[in-house]
Amino acid sequence: MKNRVCLVPAVLTIFLLCSVYAFAFEGPLQVKNQFPIFLPINQPYLEQASTESSFSLSLSHSSVFVMEDSAHWTAHLDLELTELNLRCRKDIPDLFEVGVDIPVLRATPGFMDRPLEWYHDTFGFPDYGRNTRPQNEFLYDVKKDGAPLIEGDSDRVGFGDVRLTLKKKIASIDPVISILADVELPTGNARIGYGSGSIDSAIAVLLDKDLGSETRLYANLGAVFPGDLKAHQTMKLDNFFYAGTGAESLIWPHCSLLAQIMVQTSPFPHTGISQIDNTAVIVTLGGRYYIATGSFELSLTEDPNTSGAPDFILNFSYKKRF
């Protein structure tokens, strides 16, 4: 009987600790723009201003279809892209947070053409010309002035460009405000679209704002400064800018719903290809389940203006806090 009585405080303590962890917000959903032509050019995540020590595994799968030609450019893409991203963050108290992102990529013919055909037919959405192509057949061919720029390699697994990050808080009391700087190293193969071939850099202002104890807003404003794209040809890229915002709301002690949107300009000079030139918009909806030492999240991303972004992105992520 005495042992049973002693168990009660222990169980209550564990329950309370789990409850505390459940209310520790972990930032926006770990999703970035997977448009294959843009992906190697230091694509930003929507980030939290708060710092942390953590390790994340993020698995994303997307589908892209582009069939456009202009006077000087050809962009023919019909593929699915899978990315496994290993993300590590280390908070050095009273100084800054340092981090590294290591992506592993695989472009494939995919398996989603038939489900997408059913989806478009059922709900009456346009299919962007998908019905003119054989189902689940790989194509990734980008040309400039008739010469290859990027030629994808089906089923090739390879590293993308590794990113190093540095985050510094400039305001620690709600709202939390930070400056984020990063450098992306040319570790990926640019000729097949897995890297840029140059060092890219970026800087952003991040903000977290609490609305009570169960809702948090996130906002980012940033600029990316890419080097030249050194693929089959070398071409100069433009600086591009992005803005994003999101919200997370706890609906249950261990569960939250998240919604976010990100808008970005194109890193390419004018090509005459609408899906490359126009502003990209990605909208993400998802959920997160908190555990004592981290969280799991699942999300779906859509491109409402069908430019500069995949048709959809499915993402599953796991984060462990230290």
Regions found by a protein language model. Give the residues of each.
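Bacterial N-terminal signal peptides
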Residues: 9-19
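Transmembrane beta-barrel domains of Gram-negative outer membranes and organellar outer membranes
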Residues: 24-227, 236-300, 311
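Flexible, glycine-rich linker and terminal segments associated
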Residues: 320-322
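Bacterial N-terminal signal peptides that target proteins for export
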Residues: 1-10
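A short, acidic, flexible beta-alpha connecting loop/helix-capping segment that sits on the rim
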Residues: 300-306, 315
